[in-house]
Amino acid sequence: MVYAIQDIALPVIILDLIGIFLILFKERYDPRSFILWLMILIFLPVFGFLAYLMWGCTLFEKHRFNRKYLSDRELLGPVTAEGSLIPVCEAGTDIISEGNAAFLVTSDIEDHAIQDIRGAERSIDLECGVLSRGRISSELADAANRGVRVRILTGTYGFGRTAGVRDVVSAGGRSIPFDSTLHAAFSVKNRARLGRRFMVIDDSVSYMDSGIRLEGPVSSRLGYRFEADWTYSSGDVPVEHATSAPAGDCAVQVVSGGPDCPEGSPVQSMYQFMASSSAETIVIATPFLVPDEEFHRILKLMSLSGTQVSMVFPRHGIRWYQYRNTMTAAKSLLECGVKVYFTEEDVRSTMAVSDGHLCATSPLPLSMVMMDSDFSINLVVESEDLSGSIVESIGDMMGSSNEYTLECYESRTIWDRVVFFTARMFMFMN
């Protein structure tokens, strides 16, 4: 019996030491994640190592998408500080596009998109997680029937081929999953999800999942972003994308995030720059909030320096614990004068406006871990008109919301505190 235990103990100790070595010297975790995984490995030896391989290990993604990063840089071209709205982090940051028009069309975006799809003459490129059967898929099938090149790049969860995708493919369109179905079938990790949701029509009109409609040269840049992802997934030779004529006076910069941007964190840099450069106001609406020392430090410093910082979150998140964790993470911000509101409305993407003229949109929440681990497409737009529309939309949410204060946080019941404590245990599973 003693010998049997010794035979089992040695491999377990070796596996744990390997896991601890990888966490200490190879992974790039934030302090909370680092401590969490270290505790799991120490106190749950066998389960901890298996859990680390399935949910915690990021080394495979870094190696797997490094080839994509190199090919993306070759296709998208270099970025310089002179041609950027934000401090340059070359990985993921595209060149600035001048002469664009940008509109917020959240309420009737489907009607606008259908009208533009019906007017398509050459190409429609759509990148999304899932395309269900509906009005959009029907219009895409009609476009493919009349000879428009329709390409759809979908997420791998569900293997991409939904009823809507099958309709488009049957009509002559093409569709492929972003990643291999084999990897999707055996991957249980809550990362490397496709959050790039946008559509480009004739390289002149484009739509973002956050409800932004764009006209002008930036649509061509989004076309090249799609081309980089399509080439990686399909192995096809990249096609050229025509640059459309100027359509307005907005400067737009595309910022990509995810495992194919291994050098730096471009999306984090985007939001940190916006927060730190705000002189008067910064308004943010996002699905939920998680602790992030650097970003929170910037928000607190700006608030204490006199900048009016306002943040809006939904009362009902996708997961039950996100609302409670947002309240916990917001406590330190409240202590520094940040205004926090909870709305009954649905907030599925992040929008931020700095000083009424510079705005940013992202399909992801303000979770720096998700911004590094999930694929996303983000925009930085210099436009008083678009910024005003976003501020008005967020202002409407604030008007119908309840302001969350320190008094609200301190007045929690004993049962509330138990629920908050339980929710914090799920903080790293977003």
PLM ranges: what are they?
Residues 307-311, 315-374, 382:
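C-terminal structural cap/anchor segments
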Residues 116-122, 272-283:
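Secondary-structure "cap/kink" motif recognition
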Residues 1-269, 331-335, 357, 370-373, ...:
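N-terminal localization/anchoring segments of enzymes in phospholipid and broader phosphate metabolism
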Residues 129-135, 156-160, 288-292, 316-320, ...:
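Acidic, metal-coordinating catalytic cores used for nucleic-acid/nucleotide bond scission
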Residues 163, 295, 321-324:
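Short, well-ordered secondary-structure micro-motifs
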Residues 138, 297, 326-328:
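Charged helix-capping and loop-helix junction motifs
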Residues 288-309:
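Helical hairpin unit composed of two closely spaced alpha helices linked by a short loop
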